[in-house]
UniProtKB/Swiss-Prot annotation:
Role noted for this protein: Plays a role in the different steps of crossover formation during meiotic recombination. Participates in the crossover differentiation step of crossover-specific recombination intermediates through its interaction with PRR19. In addition, stimulates crossover formation through the interactions with RFC3 and RFC4 and simultaneously regulates cell-cycle progression through interactions with CDC34 and subsequent ubiquitination of WEE1. May also participates in an active deselection process that destabilizes or removes excess pre-CO intermediates.
Domain Cyclin N-terminal: 29-180
Keywords annotated in UniProt: Chromosome, Cytoplasm, Meiosis, Nucleus
Compartment(s) where it occurs, according to its Swiss-Prot or TrEMBL record: Nucleus; Cytoplasm; Chromosome
Protein name as annotated: Cyclin N-terminal domain-containing protein 1
SUPFAM superfamilies: Cyclin-like
Keyword Transmembrane carried by entry: no
GO biological processes: reciprocal meiotic recombination; regulation of meiotic cell cycle; spermatogenesis
Observed phenotype of the null mutant: Homozygous knockout mice for CNTD1 are grossly similar to wild-type, surviving into adulthood and exhibiting appropriate mating behavior. Males are sterile with a decreased testis size. Females are also sterile.
First-listed, main subcellular location of the protein, grouped into a coarse class: nucleus
GO cellular component: chromosome; cytoplasm; nucleus
């Protein structure tokens, strides 16, 4: 493979994704593995989790991935890699600052220099995360070093190939080379596969395209959507800082996000089958139907506005109780 050749455009076709070609045993094992990873991620939800999924950052990654004709999964993977790397860097800076504040004033410059370097290299790190994510999807297109360097130069950032490789290596080392973790898309596609085997009335391929659009929306409107969920869970329009911190585990629950995305997609595609889809999702994941309905309600409210399942089915208060219980249970485990 020529890593330095020009990157030719490739349109991502949602119909390329095929359902129903994997054995049920493989699906069961994969779903169990995803559920275990999700449970671990929810338990480890920390104070600053989600800080770098800010709308402008996500939009930058999405637009860059589109410009480079990358597959959808690369965009989500890049956002998650960047999120975890930047959090790790921020934690290291805070730890260094705490240690050096106890020392001499001259040593104080060290952590400040680290912070300045982090800010100055942010665009380079972001682009490196996209490039790393593209390498995980090696069956599509890998972004070449020349493509990255030309892009950075167009923005006014001059770097060498060596600096680009060092940036990738810094990210890999910081994350202990653990960058191939599941994104919300993996949960969505796995659940769609199971729905197909369970006889869901809405075809999985039909739901898949809508799920991709709604997943983009949730990433871009991450804060408003989860804020509305938080307000519903506590039945209060002004949550306290403590309540917000306890809700972090819900923000990191990719399985909950996936069922909400699928339920919202089902309502858009065929609202008459909405309740059936929610029932299937509940039996598959064990997540309360009220919680699934509330999440889909929040997504639909921020996407199509009116004509959501809210007026027809009074789910918000029931879902609020379910989400409140989930948040309380998660916080008690931390």
């Amino acid at each position: 493979m020529n890593m330095e050749g020009p990157l030719r455009p490739r349109l991502v076709n949602c119909s390329d994704f095929q359902f129903g070609v994997v054995t049920t045993e493989t699906i069961e094992n994969a779903l169990l593995h995803l559920a275990q990873q999700n449970e671990q991620a929810v338990k480890e939800a920390a104070g600053r989790t989600g800080s770098f999924r800010e709308t402008r950052i996500v939009e930058f990654v999405f637009l860059l991935s589109e410009q480079w004709c990358l597959e959808k999964s690369v965009s989500y993977q890049a956002v998650e890699i960047l999120e975890r790397f930047m959090l790790k860097q921020a934690e290291d800076i805070c730890r260094q600052a705490t240690l050096q504040l106890r020392g001499k004033d001259t040593e104080l410059q060290s952590w400040r220099a680290m912070k300045e370097q982090l800010v100055n290299k942010f665009i380079l790190r972001l682009v490196s995360c996209v490039q790393l994510a593209s390498k995980l999807s090696f069956h599509y297109k890998i972004v070449s070093n020349i493509t990255v360097l030309n892009f950075l130069q167009a923005l006014g950032y001059v770097h060498t190939k060596e600096e680009l490789l060092e940036s990738e290596l810094d990210i890999l080392k910081s994350l202990n080379f653990q960058i191939n973790l599941p994104t919300p898309l993996a949960y969505v596609e796995m659940l769609l596969e199971v729905l197909g085997y369970n006889g869901c009335l809405v075809p999985a391929t039909q739901l898949h395209a809508t799920c991709l659009t709604l997943l983009d929306l949730v990433y871009l409107l991450h804060e408003p959507i989860y804020e509305s969920l938080l307000r519903a869970s506590i039945e209060n329009s002004t949550p306290s800082q403590l309540q917000g911190e306890k809700f972090l585990s819900v923000k990191e629950d990719f399985m909950l996000l996936a069922v909400g995305i699928i339920a919202a997609s089902a309502f858009i595609q065929n609202h008459e089958c909405w309740s059936q889809v929610i029932g299937h999702l509940q039996s598959i994941t064990g997540i309360a139907s009220e919680s699934i309905a509330e999440f889909s309600y929040a997504i639909l409210t921020h996407s199509v506005g009116a004509n959501t399942p809210g007026p027809q089915q009074p789910v918000p208060h029931k879902a609020a109780r379910a989400l409140r219980t989930a948040a309380a249970a998660a916080s008690s485990n931390t």
